[in-house]
Amino acid sequence: MSVPAVLAGIREAEAQAGRAAGTVRLVAVTKGHSLDEIRGQVLAHGDFPLAENRGQELRDKVAGLPGAEWHFIGPLQRNKIKYLRGVTLVHSIEEPWQAQAIADAAAEWGQAPAVLLQRHNGEGQKHGVLPDDLPAVLREVRATGLEVRGLMAMAPYDDEARAAQVFADTARQAQDLGLVELSMGMSGDYPLAVAAGATLVRVGRSLFA
């Protein structure tokens, strides 16, 4: 596949869900790909947000493509916070200390990223905030001064019905919490995520095939 093919798939999913074209943004996951590949196979087709899940690779690519919009989508340990300089959106906040560490570092950077809270999907997932804990975590993260835009969810890879349920539950809770951004869906399940209300879909391997 390619960026145009994925974009066509997103537009088709929007239409099938009765959503206006362009309401879903493609986030291009670039891990393992060179700057030349990113320029030639992704940015040649538009100024899409680019995303990494490894701190050092993110740092190096932000330096190489400083004009791009960068997102971080991986687990956050304390030693990764310093690599978030130049990032506009962090998708994977699951504990208030992470937000506080970002806010503290951003005071020196001069610009803070917005954040999403990662919602636990209940399927043995290692990361994410339990749904019942999200209201309290949201309050604590907002208290750090960071802008909380929405929720991020990862669905089971091999259960379409369960994936659709995870996406629907996440969208419903985001609405209940007054959050508008929904980072849901990857290469194999983004049509289901779009149908549930995703505003950001994280696609990697399909862009470079």
Swiss-Prot record:
Q: InterPro entries recorded for this chain?
A: Ala_racemase_N, PLP-binding_barrel, PyrdxlP_homeostasis
Q: What are the record keywords, sorted?
A: Pyridoxal phosphate
Key word Cell cycle present:
no
Q: Sorted alphabetically, which SUPFAM superfamilies does this protein's record hold?
A: PLP-binding barrel
GO MF terms listed in the record are: pyridoxal phosphate binding
Pfam name, any one: Ala_racemase_N
A cellular-component GO term for this protein: cytoplasm
- PROSITE patterns, from UniProt? UPF0001 (PS01211)
Tell me where in this chain the PTM N6-(pyridoxal phosphate)lysine is found.
31
Q: According to its UniProt entry, what is the function of this protein? A: Pyridoxal 5'-phosphate (PLP)-binding protein, which is involved in PLP homeostasis.
**Its family?**
Belongs to the pyridoxal phosphate-binding protein YggS/PROSC family.
Protein's recorded name: Pyridoxal phosphate homeostasis protein
Tell me the lineage of the source organism: Bacteria, Thermotogati, Deinococcota, Deinococci, Deinococcales
